[in-house]
């Protein structure tokens, strides 16, 4: 899968999760420790989020661990959580 496809997939997934949680870009940005502009750029594919930013956004959205893995995969990163118990996978920087 091309990198651009990952970006589009993540941008759509992030918008969908933000909509489910009914939070604004500003509210999400404040909770994730970034700016509203950065969230806007990520959602419109004008910025590529790093792995840590993807994790922070997923945590700020209180996404279930399985969905956090899905968001990481959508952004082109390896999953961070084991399927069995939600603990970080070995080698994770968490």
Task: Say what each PLM segment does.
Residues 1-21:
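A short, Lys/Arg-rich alpha-helix, primarily the initiator
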Residues 3, 30-31, 49-55, 59-94:
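Short amphipathic recognition helices of helix-turn-helix/homeodomain-type DNA-binding modules
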Residues 10, 35-38, 53, 67:
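Short N-terminal amphipathic alpha-helix/helix-capping patch enriched in small hydrophobics
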Residues 12, 22-23, 49-52:
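Residue-level signal for the short linker/turn that defines the boundary of a DNA-recognition helix
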Residues 15, 26, 55:
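Residues within the helices of the helix-turn-helix
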Residues 22-41:
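Short alpha-helical DNA-recognition segment
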Residues 44:
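Short, conserved catalytic or interaction motifs in soluble domains
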């Amino acid at each position: 899968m091309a990198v651009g496809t990952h970006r589009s997939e993540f941008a759509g997934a992030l918008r969908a999760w933000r909509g489910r949680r009914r939070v604004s870009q500003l509210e999400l940005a404040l909770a994730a420790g970034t700016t509203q502009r950065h969230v806007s750029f990520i959602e419109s594919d004008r910025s590529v989020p790093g792995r840590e930013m993807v994790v922070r956004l997923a945590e700020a959205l209180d996404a279930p661990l399985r969905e956090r893995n899905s968001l990481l995969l959508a952004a082109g990163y390896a999953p961070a959580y084991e399927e069995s118990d939600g603990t970080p996978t070995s080698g994770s920087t968490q």
